[in-house]
């Protein structure tokens, strides 16, 4: 969600792809935001079933295959009228597939990672300055497999910290 507005500002063709989980695309908040921006751009929303799981499992061949399928469903890509020139990565897992996506889409397509907009919004909501005092602390929580998240954190983030399982 936080990357949609910057994507509209960045896009030259005003045709924007959105790769996200099915739950995100179906959420009331996302649908309302999309509706509020409907006149500004055309959005092609693609549910990416299984991509977050493949990233967590570090299954490179599955990541490549899923990214190829999902980008094919969004296209055509390019800088001409009616082509998608910007793709929003609407899940916190998807930046870990950014290199695969960039290779599939080519240099004319901009990938919008939602990490920076999410961090800005979090900082704003918390009311803390960007370089405030105090040490940072990383807490990992998972509703799924704690071991899977621990392995992913070790591989992708190079951090070894305990993972707590939570039930929602």
Regions found by a protein language model. Name each.
Residues 1-168:
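Non-catalytic structural scaffold of enzyme domains
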């Amino acid at each position: 969600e936080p990357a949609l507005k910057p994507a509209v500002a960045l896009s030259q063709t005003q045709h924007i792809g959105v790769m996200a989980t099915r739950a995100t695309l179906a959420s009331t908040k996302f649908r309302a935001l999309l509706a509020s921006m409907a006149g500004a751009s055309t959005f092609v929303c693609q549910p990416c079933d299984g991509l977050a799981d493949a990233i967590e499992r570090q299954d490179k061949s599955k990541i490549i295959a899923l990214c190829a399928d999902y980008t094919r469903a969004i296209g055509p890509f390019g800088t001409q009228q009616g082509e998608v020139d910007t793709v929003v990565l609407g899940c916190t897992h998807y930046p870990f597939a950014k290199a695969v996506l960039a290779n599939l889409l080519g240099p004319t397509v901009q990938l919008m990672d939602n990490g920076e907009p999410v961090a800005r919004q979090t900082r704003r909501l918390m009311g803390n300055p960007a370089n405030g005092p105090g040490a940072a602390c990383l807490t990992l929580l998972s509703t799924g497999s704690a071991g899977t998240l621990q392995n992913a954190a070790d591989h992708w983030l190079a951090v070894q910290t305990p993972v707590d399982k939570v039930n929602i």
